[in-house]
From Swiss-Prot:
Ranges that cross the membrane: 8-28
Record keywords, A-Z: Disulfide bond, Fimbrium, Membrane, Methylation, Transmembrane, Transmembrane helix
PANTHER family associated with the record: GENERAL SECRETION PATHWAY PROTEIN G, PREPILIN PEPTIDASE-DEPENDENT PROTEIN D
The encoding gene: fimA
GO CC, alphabetical: membrane; pilus
Disulfide bonds: 63-105
Record protein name field: Type IV major fimbrial protein FimA
Originating organism: Dichelobacter nodosus (Bacteroides nodosus)
Length: 160
């Protein structure tokens, strides 16, 4: 009388492990890129928050206002987020009048200087995203950006 075999053979288990390993080899790098892109997107949110400050400073004809002085209530030129630090920079160019022209004001986001500490993706730590403000108030990625192109949010990618 034959005995019935129950369960999986060793070769079947090895095949399943190999398939899982192959899938993981593709999924883990894609997941790491996804995390880095989502963390880099915070920089654009920080820059959007600085738009009001830039607009207030432009009333005085400059991009940067006076440095932060909490005693006098003056709002500073930077904003710290979870994954990065955004700073207003640049020199206002009043001669630019077309909506799509850069007005000279910039926001420089440095990743890895936020409140998250070492919980930021290594793919963007220490990288910079420099956003040029256009006359119409929107931003595009500008010169000085060393963040990899695939991590730059679509909202600020320059049209090619």
């Amino acid at each position: 009388m034959k005995s019935l075999q129950k369960g999986f053979t060793l070769i079947e288990l090895m095949i399943v492990v190999a398939i899982i390993g192959i899938l993981a080899a593709f999924a883990i790098p894609a997941y790491n890129d996804y995390i880095a892109r989502s963390q880099a997107a915070e920089g654009v949110s920080l820059a959007d928050g600085l738009k009001v400050r830039i607009a207030e400073n432009l009333q005085d004809g400059e991009c940067k206002g006076p440095d932060a002085n909490t005693a006098s209530g003056v709002v500073g030129n930077e904003d710290k987020g979870k994954y990065g630090l955004a700073k207003i920079d640049g020199e206002y160019d009043a001669s630019k009048t077309e909506a799509g022209d850069p007005n000279g004001c910039k926001v420089e986001i440095t990743y890895g200087q936020g409140t998250a500490g070492d919980k930021i993706s290594k793919l963007i730590t220490g990288k910079k995203l420099v956003l040029d403000q256009l006359v119409n108030g929107s931003f595009i990625a500008g010169d000085g950006t060393d963040l990899a192109d695939k991590f730059i949010p679509n909202a600020v990618k320059a049209k090619k």
